[in-house]
Swiss-Prot record:
InterPro entries: Ribosomal_bS20, Ribosomal_bS20_sf
One GO term (biological process): translation
Protein name per the record: Small ribosomal subunit protein bS20
PANTHER family found in the cross-reference section: 30S RIBOSOMAL PROTEIN S20 (PTHR33398), SMALL RIBOSOMAL SUBUNIT PROTEIN BS20C (PTHR33398:SF1)
Superkingdom of origin: Bacteria
Keywords, sorted A to Z: Ribonucleoprotein, Ribosomal protein, RNA-binding, rRNA-binding
Cellular-component GO terms for this entry: cytosol; small ribosomal subunit
SS bond list: none
Annotated function: Binds directly to 16S ribosomal RNA.
Single GO MF descriptor: structural constituent of ribosome
Family to which this protein belongs: Belongs to the bacterial ribosomal protein bS20 family.
Length: 99
């Protein structure tokens, strides 16, 4: 337990910041889930549109120091990789002729 007045104030600040960080992280995770949900539904265009919003939220979360910038980069990279994978599966591939 905090003994000094300044330490008690610091606890209040820490609690407030923790709540703000959790809210920011929740928004980011929700945006990522929406992209994945659109991919599972087979809507590639909607997923790409939602990706731009998710990437923005991921960058904001990293800028606020809630997650590390490398973690943010990894999340965006994996999400884009997943979108590209589903996009490749949905487009028909040209058949190769046997020689």
């Amino acid at each position: 337990m905090a003994n000094t007045k300044s330490a008690k104030k610091k606890i209040k600040v820490i609690r407030r910041r923790t709540i703000e960080n959790k809210i920011q992280k929740f928004k980011m995770k929700k945006a990522i889930k929406e992209v994945k949900k659109a991919l599972l539904a087979g809507d590639i265009e909607k997923a790409k549109e939602l990706y731009s919003k998710a990437a923005k939220l991921i960058d904001q979360t990293a800028a606020k120091g809630v997650i590390h910038k490398n973690n943010a980069s990894r999340k965006k990279s994996r999400l884009m990789k997943l979108i590209n994978k589903y996009a490749a599966l949905s487009t028909p591939q040209p058949e190769k002729k046997a020689q």
